[in-house]
Amino acid sequence: MSVRTLPLLFLNLGGEMLYILDQRLRAQNIPGDKARKDEWTEVDRKRVLNDIISTMFNRKFMEELFKPQELYSKKALRTVYERLAHASIMKLNQASMDKLYDLMTMAFKYQVLLCPRPKDVLLVTFNHLDTIKGFIRDSPTILQQVDETLRQLTEIYGGLSAGEFQLIRQTLLIFFQDLHIRVSMFLKDKVQNNNGRFVLPVSGPVPWGTEVPGLIRMFNNKGEEVKRIEFKHGGNYVPAPKEGSFELYGDRVLKLGTNMYSVNQPVETHVSGSSKNLASWTQESIAPNPLAKEELNFLARLMGGMEIKKPSGPEPGFRLNLFTTDEEEEQAALTRPEELSYEVINIQATQDQQRSEELARIMGEFEITEQPRLSTSKGDDLLAMMDEL
């Protein structure tokens, strides 16, 4: 297991989360002069993205994230994204949050599987950050935060060997190995089978630095080529045009990690059979996790670096629906297995007083306070924002 995997996992999943939220917010946009108080506008969309990106790329948070450390469970990471998604005026209910996380994880899993070389997972990360910068081009302060993260990625990962990147890729694949959630977009494009497994292509560019398959060279004991044999590989491969840029700015060449929701095609984000395809999640929820204390320590370090700005004034939150209709969202909530509901685990950690206080402070921010019900569709049940740390 690589101790350099966590930043790549977090940044790429975060990028996919922002793509999905941006697409759904755009789909629900109403011109500002025509919008009611309970409807989304372009100003609201930009505010939500700015708030989430600013929180995600907070300097202290990034410092903790880039420290060498093991990956933790899906549940621990999901908790971070759930708080991150609610770092602004937006509200997602449990069914929509489930769907959002499913789409994030399956999209990045697909990208990792299709990376031509293990090192190219870094290009995928750069593609995510390049697109994120497009969301905040009018916010120079936040743009500087993202650029600083890009510099950190270049410094830390630029000198890693091919073997180290292979270990990172294997660590990511192990993390995703039990996730086979069907996504209609992938099913439509025939890149995913009905069992939730992805289809690996037998065409397209080969990895940079390699040759198109179809030729076997034979050498003697002196290293001299003595024979060539051609064979049919059954695919339609072509040489790679050029290597993607690993610099702060440049042509990444690789398209994996770009915003697949921005193309002109019907974006269907329906997740099929999520209640059946989360067996590993169910097991984690039924049985108390023996690493729960370590996961909370991990969250304390990560979340301790997050600075969440409280909304000023009694402003209602905006409800965002990740489903096509409210009825579909309600149905997903009803069919959600009870085992996936969060349960409170009491942990005695008295040996480290400072860490105990830190955990208590962080977990206190996870508490949800009662909000008065509003008649607006985007203002009810707003999750309480985490206090600024």
UniProtKB/Swiss-Prot annotation:
Keywords on record: Cell membrane, Membrane, Transport
InterPro entries on file: OSCP1
Record bears the keyword Repressor: no
Molecular function via GO: transmembrane transporter activity
Superkingdom, taxonomy of origin: Eukaryota
Protein localization: Basal cell membrane
Tissue: Expressed predominantly in testis, also found in placenta and to a lesser extent in thymus and small intestine; abundantly expressed in tumor-derived cell lines. Ubiquitously expressed.
Gene Ontology CC, one term: plasma membrane
Comment field (misc): May be involved in the development and/or progression of nosopharyngeal carcinoma.
UniProt name for this protein: Protein OSCP1
Upper classification of the organism: Eukaryota, Metazoa, Chordata, Craniata, Vertebrata
